[in-house]
Each structure stands twice: as structure tokens, then as C-alpha cells.
Amino acid sequence: MQVFRAVVLFILAGLAEIAGGYLVWQWLRADRSIWFGVLGAILLVGYGFLPTLQPQVWSFGRVYAAYGGVFIVLSLAWGWLIDHNPPDQPSLVGACLALVGAAIILYWPR
């Protein structure tokens, strides 16, 4: 259950960060309404809160380092699904390596 909870929290944090950043980008770079920026800022605050719900046994550094692997995968998925820019083979290999690294950071016996 701890692994499932960690994965769900990482995915929620990643979606909040990516969607928040994307909305701010749309506001500032694509001349969208200021409400895109406001909603983006709210999502980015949510992103900052979600990692604090991870298990107490993990330090800040470990949580954020492992989150980086999940962020890489979610960023590539967002680019593919939202921006219609599919990842190439080296990007997919790199994302898999990042996930392996994230798992080692969190779950390697200490």
C-alpha cells in the first residue's frame, strides 16, 4: 500500500506542476487570459503541498530526487498528449532509467 500511495502522490504532484506551469506558459507566452495564470499558480501551490504527504521515513531530498524520475515521464506524456509531440526512443530509454533511479533512491535497503 505504501508504494501505491507514493506513486499516486508523485503522479498528482507531477500533474499539478506540469499543468500549472503549462497554464502560466499559456498566459505569458500564448497571450491567454490572466485566469490561465491564476489557475496555474493555484496548481503550482498544490504541487508544493503534495510531496509533504509522502511517508515520514523519507527525507525531503529523497522525495524530491525520486519525484524527478516521475516528473520526466509525466513531462514526456504531457508533451505527447497535449502538445502532440511524441517522445523519441532516446527519450523513452532515458525516462525508464530515471524511473529505475527513482526506485533505487526510495526503496534500496539501508
Swiss-Prot record:
It comes from the Bacteria. It is found in: Cell membrane. InterPro entries: UPF0060 (IPR003844). One of its GO terms (cellular component) is plasma membrane. Signal peptide: none annotated. Keywords: Cell membrane, Membrane, Transmembrane, Transmembrane helix. The chain crosses the membrane at residues 7-27, 33-53, 63-83, 89-109. It holds the Pfam family UPF0060. SUPFAM superfamilies: Multidrug resistance efflux transporter EmrE. The keyword Membrane applies. It is a multi-pass membrane protein. HAMAP family: UPF0060. Belongs to the UPF0060 family. This is UPF0060 membrane protein Haur_1798. It comes from Herpetosiphon aurantiacus (strain ATCC 23779 / DSM 785 / 114-95).
